[in-house]
Amino acid sequence: MLTTRRLNAYIAATVMVLAVLIQQVVTEGLLSDFDRSARLTARSIRASHDVFSVTVMLGLRGIILTVCLPILGWVSLKRRSWLPIAGFLIVLVFETGIAGALKISVGRIFPYQYESFFSRMMIGQDEMAFPSGHAANCVALWGYMVWYFTQAGSVLRRAGIWLVVLASCIVGVSSWLIRTHWPTDLFAGYAVGFSALVAVIGLYTALGFNPEATTHYSQEAHRETADAQ
């Protein structure tokens, strides 16, 4: 289970990462130079837009909701409890709210806006690149599903974590290659998603809603997930 000490450490670490990234982006520090270099590298690679515009959708909110909500709805209905789906929705609100507030306050343009005359004309109207919502969605929402339906220390939990990491990397690399986000946007998105996920896990644990509270409860969650799938 997530202890208070670990929760505080995780939140503090992600806040520090976000603070550094925001400072570097706003002041155009060394990481901004890295971003510009990464954009030129991605442009020179000329990756297939058709392929990577599909793989980046692993972090698309609509697709994640389409997959997860029916499963969570089924489990909530069968258990006659709002807890499974409510936790997911709280994570969604947290990460969307944090990411949205940062997008508005930082006001950063997208890499592709350098690519054509028309896109450059849009500068000043569409400055919502930082942080990446796709990266935040991937960590927060897929991460919640892994946490809720697996037991700590189990093979399924470890496999699920690695799948979330893999999906997050695919989203990040895809977004970089098709130049929809700067690398620092993606790192910030990961931090936002992780902080939202950890906050909700901490909340559920503090309220006694953690599915690992009893062995019986955890086994029931496994059975219901299998039924829903």
What are these regions (language model features)?
Residues 1-67, 104-122:
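N-terminal transmembrane-helix/juxtamembrane module of multi-pass inner/ER membrane proteins
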Residues 27-32, 80-81, 104-112, 180, ...:
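Transmembrane helix-loop junctions in multipass membrane proteins, especially transporters and channels
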Residues 42, 98, 102, 106, ...:
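Alpha-helical membrane-inserting segments
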Residues 66-78, 143-148:
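Hydrophobic, aromatic-rich transmembrane alpha-helices
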Residues 116-229:
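Membrane-embedded catalytic cores of phosphoryl/pyrophosphoryl-handling enzymes
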Residues 96-101, 131, 135:
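Mid-bilayer segments of alpha-helical transmembrane spans in multi-pass integral membrane proteins
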Residues 17-21, 93-100, 166-176:
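Aromatic-anchored segments of alpha-helical transmembrane domains
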Residues 5-13, 70-98, 161:
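Interfacial segments of alpha-helical transmembrane regions
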